[in-house]
């Protein structure tokens, strides 16, 4: 049987095209993930710079000013310094738990960004259970902190890990109940649907006005989940040296440093999505498409405006947790647990009951 050379060349060209399609398909799948990771990294750098500048202003001192223009590259310089430091491991600790703990904390928070809409349907995964996916994933992070504390074989580290687990359990329940109230109000658990439900009524349709009690409980619970003052008991310097971070150095310590700011950013983004209308500007009697002529200029410009509005709301809200760091004193452990179980939990349950009743009456 004789096969023509042209047929062989045609078959080879088809196989090359198929392989190129597979490569391009993989690149196209990874491109949104890479873009999201790059955006999150830049966002964390901006948060660190903002916190240092605001903290310097509150304390009436000069903030970072040498690393880059206005000191904006200070966080990058700190990260480079941590990368170059020696990575020490306790000789008497559990090496596996000690090494895995920081990675679990960072990865679980990173996954939360996959359900955050930064613009009109600009979301990595528009899940029907988006907000509860975030709550489920974020509950894994304290497991990593507990593993880090136990694997360090240090009493201060272990106590810090236990505190992190107890604090997370205490405040995740009120947080979840507030999110459930929002889901009932929006008739959906998708983050995109929640934003669109708020956009129907303009500025006064934000869940900030429709759920004021839930917003306050959500704000306090998210601060506790981020372990920000006055809820930073797992790493209280005066009591536990550095808590579960005591034995860490180098890149592993840097992962905890990144995780804290990632958690702060994701909490602020969810406040924007759940309570502040997301990517909708919602100025009374003025809508973003008519204001900027988005319908005339195409979807790309509208998407960019949506991203800008979302990030602007997020960074404006970030002033609250940064200001509370230098305003409020740290709570005791018994005060923290009492606040979560005796006050926030009953209030969030009452808010859920009121929301359910109002939804039934509106039918």
From Swiss-Prot:
Membrane topology category: Multi-pass membrane protein
InterPro entries membership: NADH_UbQ_OxRdtase_su1/FPO (IPR001694), NADH_UbQ_OxRdtase_su1_CS (IPR018086)
Reactions catalysed, as given in the entry: a plastoquinone + NADH + (n+1) H(+)(in) = a plastoquinol + NAD(+) + n H(+)(out); a plastoquinone + NADPH + (n+1) H(+)(in) = a plastoquinol + NADP(+) + n H(+)(out)
Pfam assignment, any one: NADHdh
GO biological process: one example: photosynthesis, light reaction
Keywords: Chloroplast, Membrane, NAD, NADP, Plastid, Plastoquinone, Quinone, Thylakoid, Translocase, Transmembrane, Transmembrane helix
Membrane-spanning intervals of the chain: 30-50, 98-118, 127-147, 165-185, 203-223, 248-268, 300-320, 336-356
EC main group: translocase
GO cellular component, one term: chloroplast thylakoid membrane
Subcellular location: Plastid, Chloroplast thylakoid membrane
EC identifiers of the protein: 7.1.1.-
Source domain of life: Eukaryota
A GO molecular-function descriptor: oxidoreductase activity, acting on NAD(P)H, quinone or similar compound as acceptor
Function recorded in the entry: NDH shuttles electrons from NAD(P)H:plastoquinone, via FMN and iron-sulfur (Fe-S) centers, to quinones in the photosynthetic chain and possibly in a chloroplast respiratory chain. The immediate electron acceptor for the enzyme in this species is believed to be plastoquinone. Couples the redox reaction to proton translocation, and thus conserves the redox energy in a proton gradient.
UniProt family annotation: Belongs to the complex I subunit 1 family.
Assembly: NDH is composed of at least 16 different subunits, 5 of which are encoded in the nucleus.
Name of the protein: NAD(P)H-quinone oxidoreductase subunit 1, chloroplastic
């Amino acid at each position: 049987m004789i096969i023509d050379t042209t047929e062989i060349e045609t078959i080879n060209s088809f196989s090359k095209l198929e392989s190129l399609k597979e490569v391009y398909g993989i690149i196209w799948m990874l491109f949104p993930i890479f873009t999201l990771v790059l955006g999150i990294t830049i966002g964390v750098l901006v948060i660190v710079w903002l916190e240092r500048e605001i903290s310097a202003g509150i304390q009436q001192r000069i903030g970072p000013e040498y690393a880059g223009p206005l000191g904006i590259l200070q966080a990058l310089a700190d990260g480079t310094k941590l990368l170059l430091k020696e990575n020490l491991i306790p000789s008497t600790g559990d090496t596996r738990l000690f090494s895995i703990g920081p990675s679990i904390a960072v990865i679980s928070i990173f996954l939360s960004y996959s359900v955050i809409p930064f613009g009109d349907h600009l979301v990595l995964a528009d899940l029907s259970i988006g907000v509860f996916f975030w709550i489920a994933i974020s509950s894994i992070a304290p497991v990593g902190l507990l593993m880090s504390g136990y694997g360090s074989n240090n009493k201060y580290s272990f106590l810090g890990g236990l505190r992190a687990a107890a604090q997370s359990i205490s405040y995740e329940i009120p947080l979840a109940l507030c999110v459930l109230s929002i889901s009932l109000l929006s008739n959906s658990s998708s983050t995109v649907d929640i934003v669109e439900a708020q956009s129907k009524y303009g500025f006064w349709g934000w869940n900030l006005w429709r759920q004021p009690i839930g917003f306050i409980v959500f704000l306090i619970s998210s601060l506790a989940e981020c372990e920000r003052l006055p809820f930073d008991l797992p790493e209280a310097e005066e009591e536990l040296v550095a808590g579960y971070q005591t034995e860490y150095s180098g890149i592993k310590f840097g992962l905890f440093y990144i995780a804290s700011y990632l958690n702060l950013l994701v909490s602020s983004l969810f406040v924007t999505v759940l309570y502040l209308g997301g990517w909708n500007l919602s100025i009374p009697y003025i809508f973003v498409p008519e204001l900027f002529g988005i319908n005339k200029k195409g979807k790309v410009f509208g998407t960019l405006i949506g991203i800008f509005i979302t990030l602007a709301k997020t960074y404006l809200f970030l002033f609250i947790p940064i200001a509370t760091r230098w305003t409020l004193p740290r709570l005791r452990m018994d005060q923290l647990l009492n606040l979560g179980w005796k006050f926030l939990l009953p209030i969030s349950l009452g808010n859920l009951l009121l929301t359910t009743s109002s939804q039934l009456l509106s039918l």
